Amino acid sequence: MLKYIIPTIMLMPLTWMSKNSMIWTNTTAHSLLISLTSLLLLNQFNDNSLNFSPMFFSDPLSTPLLILTMWLLPLMLMASQSHLLKEPPTRKKLFITMLITLQTFLIMTFSAMELILFYILFEATLIPTLIIITRWGNQTERLNAGLYFLFYTLMGSLPLLVALIYIQNITGSLNFLMLQYWTQAVSNSWSNVFLWLACMMAFMVKMPLYGLHLWLPKAHVEAPIAGSMVLAAILLKLGGYGMLRITTILNPLTEMMAYPFIMLSLWGMIMTSSICLRQTDLKSLIAYSSVSHMALVIVAILIQTPWSYMGATALMIAHGLTSSMLFCLANSNYERIHSRTMILARGLQTLLPLMAAWWLLASLTNLALPPTINLVGELLVIMSSFSWSNITIILMGTNIMITTLYSLYMLTTTQRGKYTHHINNITPSFTRENALMALHILPLLLLSLNPKIILGPLY
C-alpha cells in the first residue's frame, strides 16, 4: 500500500514548491497519475500477498473504495479552481494541502489492518474536513455546520473506542484477518447488546441513519465544492465500510439486533426521498437524496446475505460517483448564478446545452436507469430484502418511484422553462468543467460493462 500512500504524501512538497501559475496543473496531473496507477489494485484479487503488511492490506472489499478515493482527488482539484480564484497563492496551497492530507488519511483508513488503527484514522479524517468546511465554506452558517458535523461524529464514535478496547481484552487481537476466526459466538446478554450498539453507532452516524442525519444537509450546503464532493463520495462510505467489516465479527447478535434498524432505515428511505420533493435548495436536495441512498446500503448490510453485501458495495461506489457529479453540476450553476435556489436557475438548457446533457446523464444515473451500476446495486438489495421479508417490496417500490420523481423534478426545474432575466450574460461552460463531468460519468458507464469488480469479496 505504500506505493499509493507515499506518492500522495509527496504531493504536498510538490504543491508548495510549484510556481503560482502551475499550482493546479502540477497537482492535478500528478494526482491523476496516482489514481491511474491505483487501477493496478484490481489485478491483485487472486494474489493478495502482493499488497499485504502488518499495517495495511487490501482485499476485494476495500479495493473499489480505495480506487474511488484516489480517483476523486484530481476531480476535487479540478472542481475547486474557480472557487479559489481570488484567494492568494498561499491560501490556495493550504487548501490543496488539506485535500491531500484528507486523501492520505482516507487511503490509510480503507487499507488499515487493525481495528484501532482504523478507528484512529477514521477520526483523523474529521480534522481536514472540518477545516475545509469552516474555512472555505460559502455562507456564515458554516461554523454552525462544522460544529454539527464534529459533535455528531464524535458522540457516535466515543462508545466505539470503549467497545474496541473491550473486544481487544476478550480476544487479544484486533486484527481484521484474525477476528474472522473468532469462534466464540456473541451471546445476546445485555452487555453484548450495548457492545453491538457501541460498535454500530459510530458508523450509523457516519452513514447516516435516518434520525442521526441532521448534520449531513447542513455540512453539505455550507461546504465548498471539494468538501461536498469528498463528503458525499467517500466519507459516507467510511460508515458502510466499517459496518461491513464489523457486522461479521458480531454474529449471531446482529441477526437479532438488526430488526429495529432495518425498519428505521426503510422508513427513513421513504421519508428523505419525500423531503427531496419539497426542497427549493439544489444542494440540500442532493444531500437528502444521499441519505435515502445510504439507507438502502444500511438495510443491505444488516440483512447479511451474500447478495445484499454485493448490492451494498455496488451501491456505495455508484452513489459515490453519481452524487459527486450532481454536486459538481450544482456548483457550476452556483458559480454562474450565485444562488442555490432552483427557481432562479431555470431554463438553463437554452443557454448551456452541453451542461444540460450532463444534467440529464447525472439525473438518469441517480434514478438508477438500466444499464448503470446504480441499477445493479439496487436490484441486488431489493432482491435480498424481498427474500428477507416480502412486505419490503412495497416500500422499495415506493422509494424507486419517489426517487424517479425528485430526480426528474430537479432536472426539469433547472433545465426547462423560461429562463429568468437576471441570467442573460452567463459564461459558457469551460473545458475544465466538461472534462470533470466526463471523468465522473465514464467510470459509471464503463463499470456497467464489468460490474463484478465492485461487487465486493463474495463475488
Curated annotation (Swiss-Prot):
Residue ranges crossing the lipid bilayer per the database entry: 22-42, 60-80, 92-112, 113-133, 147-167, 193-213, 224-244, 257-277, 284-303, 308-330, 351-371, 391-411
Membrane topology type: Multi-pass membrane protein
Broad class of the protein's primary localization: mitochondrion
Catalytic activity: a ubiquinone + NADH + 5 H(+)(in) = a ubiquinol + NAD(+) + 4 H(+)(out)
A molecular-function term among this protein's GO annotations: NADH dehydrogenase (ubiquinone) activity
Record's keyword terms, sorted: Electron transport, Membrane, Mitochondrion, Mitochondrion inner membrane, NAD, Respiratory chain, Translocase, Transmembrane, Transmembrane helix, Transport, Ubiquinone
InterPro entries recorded: NADH4_N (IPR000260), NADH_Q_OxRdtase_chainM/4 (IPR010227), NADH_UbQ_OxRdtase (IPR003918), ND/Mrp_TM (IPR001750)
Compartment(s): Mitochondrion inner membrane
EC number: 7.1.1.2
Keyword NAD: yes
Cellular component, GO, one term: mitochondrial inner membrane
One of the Pfam families matching this protein, by short name: Oxidored_q5_N
A biological-process GO annotation: electron transport coupled proton transport
Protein family membership: Belongs to the complex I subunit 4 family.
Matches recorded under PANTHER family: NADH-UBIQUINONE OXIDOREDUCTASE CHAIN 4
Subunit structure: Core subunit of respiratory chain NADH dehydrogenase (Complex I) which is composed of 45 different subunits.
Role description: Core subunit of the mitochondrial membrane respiratory chain NADH dehydrogenase (Complex I) which catalyzes electron transfer from NADH through the respiratory chain, using ubiquinone as an electron acceptor. Essential for the catalytic activity and assembly of complex I.
Full protein name: NADH-ubiquinone oxidoreductase chain 4
Organism: Hippopotamus amphibius
Lineage: Eukaryota, Metazoa, Chordata, Craniata, Vertebrata
